[in-house]
Amino acid sequence: MAAEFDGKIESKGLNPGLIVLLVIGGLLLTFLVGNFILYTYAQKNLPPRKKKPVSKKKMKKEKMKQGVQVPGE
């Protein structure tokens, strides 16, 4: 019985679905590692972001809420 199957077993190589999964997984892993490296580099070397300047109108409103007299009024 074992002699019947000797010639019929062939090596087909890797499954095409497995190859696609490995390629997509590799690309995703490369993307995530690259993002992490860029993020750590930016945290060390880039200056902190500047805050937006507060408008004079908003400053007056805040001071009015606190009850402080606004100069010039």
Swiss-Prot record:
Location within or outside the cell: Nucleus
Biased composition (Basic residues): 47-63
Record GO terms (molecular function): DNA binding
Pfam families, sorted: S1FA
Region described as Disordered: 47-73
Annotated Gene Ontology cellular component terms: nucleus
Major localisation: nucleus
Any one GO biological process: regulation of DNA-templated transcription
Motif Nuclear localization signal: chain residues: 47-52
InterPro entries per record: S1FA_DNA-bd (IPR006779)
Superkingdom per UniProt: Eukaryota
Keywords: DNA-binding, Nucleus, Repressor, Transcription, Transcription regulation
Primary role: DNA-binding protein that specifically recognizes a negative element (S1F) within the RPS1 promoter.
Family named by the database record: Belongs to the S1FA transcription factor family.
UniProt-listed PANTHER family: DNA-BINDING PROTEIN S1FA2 (PTHR35298), DNA-BINDING PROTEIN S1FA3 (PTHR35298:SF5)
Official protein name in the record: DNA-binding protein S1FA3
